[in-house]
A protein has these predicted regions:
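Glycine-rich phosphate-binding loop plus the immediately following alpha-helix
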Residues: 120-165, 187-188, 192-198
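Short beta-strand segments
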Residues: 48-50, 81, 105-110, 117
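N-terminal beta-alpha supersecondary unit
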Residues: 1-53, 82, 86
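Conserved phosphate-binding catalytic cores of ATP/NTP-utilizing and phosphoryl-transfer enzymes
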Residues: 80-104
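Short Gly/Thr/Asp-enriched flexible loops that form oxyanion-binding sites at enzyme active sites
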Residues: 49-73, 92-93
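A contiguous, well-structured pocket-lining segment that forms one wall/lid of small-molecule binding clefts
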Residues: 158-236
Length: 236
């Protein structure tokens, strides 16, 4: 359903390409989902679509398709905040899975978002911490680009990190007040570290790639966990 191949040569998501790919794929994807569910379009009793946040071009494609389908079938149209959707996905009925009890804290982490959310009820949510610059996914992708790992770099760094020593190298964690995050400084620190070490030893990356990835991931996870622990204390 989803592919990053159209963005790989650019080292990141290109909004125009993303919206075009979305436009090409949305009809066959919906058709496939309906067939897999063993129903027809006439069995639908509502259309939920992502209103935001996200890339404007892709959001417009989804909105236009959803409105057209709902109008054609004469069924309700339901706007969804996709970050709320991530949190509420935990309430889908799954055998053997215990649903969260309100209130609880949720952390949403992706290529474009990093948030800590206090969830009091299904539609009572408050963002109590978020990134003031770059998201976690961007930190992974930019680090991967510096290391020559390609895009998307997150899965590659995660895989290599399992083979390395997370305490081999130390990167300074950004100091941000409250529950907010910042990853731009970490990206810069990693870039300067790699430039410095490869100047002294050209094969530094190749010889230490597992340890570098492990150290980067260890630092990022610690930043997230420190803020989450602080959020737990402040919301008890």
């Amino acid at each position: 359903i989803a592919t990053q191949s159209v963005h790989r040569e650019y080292g990141g998501v290109v909004p125009e390409l993303a919206s075009r790919a979305h436009q090409q794929n949305i009809v066959p994807v919906v058709d496939q989902a309906i067939k897999k569910a063993g129903i027809s379009k006439n069995d639908l009793n509502g259309i939920a679509f992502t209103k935001g946040p996200g890339l404007m071009g892709s959001l417009l494609v989804g909105t236009s398709f959803a409105k057209s389908l709902a109008l054609g079938l004469n069924i309700p149209l339901i706007e969804v905040n996709h970050m709320q959707g991530h949190l509420l996905a935990h309430f889908i009925d799954v055998e053997g899975y215990e649903k969260p009890k309100f209130p609880f804290l949720g952390m949403t982490i992706s290529g474009g978002h990093t948030q800590i959310v206090k969830v009091d009820d299904y539609f009572e949510m408050k963002v109590i911490g978020e990134t003031i610059d770059d998201a976690v996914g961007e930190a992974y992708d930019k680090s991967g680009k510096v290391l020559g790992l390609g895009y998307p770099a997150g899965p590659i760094i995660d895989k290599l990190a399992k083979l390395g020593n997370p305490k081999a190298f130390t990167f300074t964690k950004p100091k941000v007040d409250g529950l907010n995050f910042s990853f731009s400084g970490l990206k810069t620190a990693i870039l300067y570290f790699i430039q410095k070490e490869t100047t002294k030893k050209p094969n530094f990356i190749q010889e230490n790639i597992n340890d570098i990835c492990a150290s980067i991931q260890y630092t990022i996870i610690n930043i997230l966990m420190d803020k989450l622990k602080k959020a737990v204390k402040e919301t008890r």
